[in-house]
Design a protein with these regions (language model features):
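Extra-cytoplasmic beta-strand recognition segments
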Residues: 655-682, 711-718, 750
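Beta-strand acidic-aromatic groove motif in beta-rich domains, primarily in extracellular
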Residues: 654-656, 679-693, 726
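Short, well-ordered secondary-structure micro-motifs within conserved domains or adaptor modules
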Residues: 66-88
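Extracellular carbohydrate recognition and processing domains
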Residues: 693-725
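Catalytic domains of carbohydrate-active enzymes that cleave complex glycans
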Residues: 407, 433-630, 634-641, 646-665, ...
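Feature activates predominantly on carbohydrate-active enzymes
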Residues: 32, 41-44, 49-52, 56, ...
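Structured mid-domain segments that build the active-site/substrate or prosthetic-cofactor binding neighborhood
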Residues: 241-244, 252, 355-458, 462, ...
């Protein structure tokens, strides 16, 4: 017994002497000398935190730490404990042979991730991969102390890298989850989790479906211009039956999904708010349509609170509801998302003199004066050009700081799809700055590029330096909202920038990673998508596809199109093999349509002889049209296919640039279109369709359509301009209770004929 006491005393003395030494949790090639202890009450998140720590230490050092419920006092331990008062926060501290990770039900996980990031140099990128460098030992410094709380209580982004992957979302410390995300208890409770039945925005159509209610109750829907609207409508928010329907559906949805803590009650994604006498009177008193909206949402929230006092009713301050009401305040269980979609993303909100950004600063101040439960819905992508360069990275940090300093507690930043403009990098930056907006950009850029691009990190930083220089130039040119169209005339990022970016990514960076892992090579290849797409889109806007010139040799065609198309197409195919839908998943607009466009350029050949007649078929036009039209099989069309134009009032179905036509400047041309109009009835009245070229406009009424089937309609005769655009769309119908005059409208081709 005396010998045992001496041995124990000796061991304790040695330990005390070594107290000032770093705590080695694992050493490569040695048996584990440290245990992970999950303390009582840590729950499923504590157990999962231990699993994550063990996994990352093993991947880093090759050593698997045992997980125990207790350990001898002299054994080295990592202790994981729950303190619910910390919420998302955590405390990290080293003691005598002990490293403690204490956090709230999410914070305990975040404490583990902070540990492996800080001491294991591990970097989380999203659902593509995690960077885990190999180490000889996993070491925690002696006398280490750290306590953290996030800058924002709620943090989220919809960049595709983390949109639906709960593991990645948790590792990057995002905690606002959207509809359809399944969250197990081990990930901790979500800050906001919406019911499965409805989403978190634009829910009116789901709550009161027009197909279910309009026929018998048109009074439930917007009153506009003397009629109740079924399509492209909102709800009549002063109708008591609408309130009953919505409140009951919200309560039922919360009953059916006990894990949810929020239900969305918000306008459809358009304007057309109800202008009936009662709604209009409230809007006038409140100074905004938000008055009617928030009176309605508050009434729903009051009923929800009776059965679900701890649940949120979420709504939007967006478009026609973004102006705060003068009299009504959101109820204490209403969560208001202020959508700042109009912001100029190229200039910091704090200093921008752009009227849209000045207005947003004002709106943030006015809304925060009304409610502490304001969530900012911000944006970090360009929906008109998802795969083009966008100048928002230099302003991201400043804008996040702006919201932090204004007292915003929850921030959601909407993003794009896989491999959209710097999506992987922006996901990483957003995750770090929503937690701590003061982390220096340079530190994050270095960590990300070293880990993500491997040996191509110098080239990546060269590109980012050049990108930021051009972004500074963008600030003096225009307002960069999330709906900006790039054209050669505007050249927001000039051809010089695109050519330099192509050299960096397609030549220099690829050469640097030829011996790297497949993941690193893939990352570099996908970075090259952006300049390739921009190059092809610029070419597409200026390269002839229709030849009606007597001198075709005078028109330039891209020399490298065929070679570069192979580069571009190869990247798309590799992305699809990995299950990456490029862009935001709009299959026609972001996969079939651009690739047809780019492929046509890759196969383009200049005709050997001149011509006085040519046709722009629906397929040629489709490369430039908007998503309002779809190419369909049509036996009556000359080529067996036609463009079916969406049957919506006044919307453009076909858009075709004269810059894509090789014509002679001195020539006089006659243009006509082959179109088919299918009436809703023989006696239908109203405008069937319209066509426009330059200043010339032709409108055709339904009653003037003489026969069924395709007919030729004259459009223009004279000289042409490369600046002109041919457009065709459905007309402004005599709706008569919402019934359209045209059942179907199809475009076959546009004919060009030289007259002299």
């Amino acid at each position: 017994m005396r010998a045992l006491k001496v041995a124990v005393a000796g061991a304790l003395a040695c330990a005390l002497c070594a107290e000032a030494s770093p705590l080695v949790l694992a050493e490569r090639g040695k048996a584990p000398s440290c245990s992970v202890v999950v303390e009582k009450g840590a729950g499923p998140t504590g157990a999962y935190a231990a699993e994550e720590l063990v996994m990352f230490v093993r991947e880093s050092t090759g050593v698997t730490l045992p997980v125990d419920s207790w350990a001898w006092p002299w054994r080295k331990t990592v202790r994981i404990a729950l303190d619910e008062s910390l919420g998302d926060g955590f405390r990290l501290e080293t003691g005598w042979r002990t490293y403690r990770i204490t956090g709230g039900r999410r914070g305990v996980l975040y404490g583990v991730y902070e540990t492996v990031e800080r001491f294991g140099d591990i970097i989380f990128f999203g659902d593509i991969r995690t960077h885990v460098p190999k180490k000889d030992a996993f070491v925690v410094p002696d006398r280490f102390r750290d306590a953290q709380q996030p800058a924002f209580l709620g943090r989220s982004t919809t960049w595709k890298e983390v949109r639906t992957n709960i593991v990645s979302r948790t590792r990057l410390r995002f905690n606002l989850h959207r509809r359809g995300t399944v969250v197990e208890p081990k990930f901790g409770p979500e800050e906001i989790k919406y019911v499965k039945e409805f989403g978190d925005c634009h829910t009116f159509r789901d709550l009161v479906p027009p197909d279910e209610y309009f026929a018998k109750h048109p009074e439930y829907f917007s009153y506009l211009n003397g009629i109740r609207r079924k399509d492209k409508s909102q709800l009549c928010l002063t109708n008591p039956d609408v309130l009953d329907i919505v409140a009951k559906k919200c309560i039922a949805a919360l009953d059916a999904d006990p894990s949810a803590n929020a239900v969305g009650v918000s306008q459809n994604d358009r304007r057309n708010q109800c202008q009936c006498e009662t709604c209009a009177a409230i809007d006038k008193v409140e100074g905004s349509s938000s008055g009617t909206m928030f009176r309605f949402v508050n009434a729903v929230a009051e009923r929800v609170k009776e059965t679900h006092p701890d649940k949120w009713v979420q709504t939007l301050a967006y478009q026609y509801t973004r102006e705060p009401p003068k009299l009504t305040k959101p109820a204490d269980n209403v969560l208001t998302y202020l959508c700042v979609i109009e912001a100029d993303l190229a200039r910091p909100l704090t200093t921008s003199t752009c009227p849209a950004s000045v207005k947003i600063r004002e709106l943030v101040d006015r809304w925060t004066a009304l409610t502490p439960n304001l969530v900012i819905w911000a944006y970090s992508t360009n929906y008109r050009e998802l795969l083009h360069t966008f100048p928002d990275v230099p302003t991201l940090q400043d804008n996040i700081r702006f919201y932090r300093d204004r007292g915003i507690r929850r921030l959601f930043i909407e993003g794009g799809g896989y491999h959209s403009h710097l999506g992987e990098f922006k996901t990483y930056l957003i995750s770090k700055w929503l937690w701590n907006p003061d982390v220096p950009y340079e530190e994050l850029e270095r960590k990300f590029t070293d880990a993500y691009y491997g040996k191509a990190a110098p080239q990546a930083r060269e590109y980012l330096k050049m990108y930021r220089e051009y972004c500074a130039k963008c600030q003096s040119k225009m307002r960069w909202s999330c709906w900006v169209v790039d054209t050669p005339e505007k050249e927001y990022f000039p051809d010089e920038f695109i050519d330099k970016a192509m050299k960096i990514w397609i030549e220099d960076a690829l050469a640097a990673v030829k011996d790297e892992s497949e993941d690193v090579r893939y990352a570099v290849e996908m970075a090259g998508l952006e300049p390739l797409v921009m190059k092809f889109d610029r070419w597409c806007e200026t390269t002839p596809r229709v030849w009606v010139s007597r001198h075709p040799e005078t028109f330039a065609v891209p020399k490298d199109a065929a070679r570069l198309y192979k580069e571009l197409d190869g990247r798309f195919r590799k992305a699809l093999k990995r299950g990456r839908d490029i862009g935001i998943g709009n299959e026609r607009a972001l996969w079939q349509w651009p690739r047809r466009n780019w492929k046509a350029l890759g196969e383009l050949k200049r005709p050997a002889k001149g011509s006085d007649r040519a046709e722009a078929t629906c397929r040629v036009v489709d490369t430039e049209s908007t998503s309002r039209g779809d190419v369909v099989k049509d036996g009556e069309a000359a080529g067996g296919e036609a463009m079916r134009i969406a049957n919506s009032s006044s919307e453009v179905g076909v858009y075709f640039r004269m810059a894509n036509v090789a014509f002679d400047a001195e020539g006089v041309y006659r243009l006509r279109a082959r179109v088919k109009v299918e009436k809703t009835s023989p006696n239908a009245k109203g405008e069937a369709f319209w066509m426009k070229l330059g200043e010339k406009e032709v409108r055709v009424n339904v009653e003037d359509v003489a026969a069924d089937g395709y007919q030729w309609y004259d459009l223009y005769e004279g000289k042409l301009s490369r600046d002109w655009v041919f457009r065709i769309g459905c007309g402004n119908f005599a709706r008569g209770g919402g019934v359209k005059a045209v059942k179907d409208l199809r475009f076959d081709r546009l004919e060009f004929m030289r007259c002299e």
